[in-house]
């Protein structure tokens, strides 16, 4: 998996440096999360312009598209839900058994979330989960996941600076 992660990161860096499209970066980074880090599903969700709703835009992996369609959440300012906490703090998280509002949408396997940042603020998140009974998310896997999400953020900033045409 480490070799696969590195190969995808190289390809992703080349894409970002060439001003590639954000959607291409999402697919490459998601491939890294799925194949290189060992998650089963990935959802990339972006905040609506009013910043009160989080909407799934990309879903990859086994059941990822179904999960994406269900991934529509209204944010609560000051809420203690894992999603609200991530948006308010911009800190990646490993999710425990308590999934908050995600419980009715996502699976029960080990999961993590990390923010997609743009211009110093959270503009979305990446949710990734493993199948139930899969290995817990150790530090190495968690930091690799976060690194791929950071690459997505860089791709978004680069695409936006290129005139917005390449942004989501």
For the regions a language model picked out, list residue spans one by one:
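Regulatory/sensor and coupling segments of signal-transduction and defense proteins
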Residues: 1-11, 62-66, 98, 125
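Signal-transmission linkers at sensory-effector interfaces
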Residues: 1-23, 158, 162-168
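Amphipathic alpha-helical regulatory segments at dimerization interfaces
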Residues: 11, 15, 27-36, 85, ...
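Helix-loop-beta substructure at the N-terminus of cytosolic sensory domains
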Residues: 16-57
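Acidic/proline- and glycine-rich, intrinsically disordered low-complexity segments
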Residues: 55, 60-92, 99, 147
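A short, aliphatic-rich beta-strand micro-motif
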Residues: 109-118
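Amphipathic alpha-helical "output/dimerization" segments
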Residues: 118, 136-158
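Short beta-strand-to-loop transition segments that serve as allosteric relay/switch motifs
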Residues: 125-136
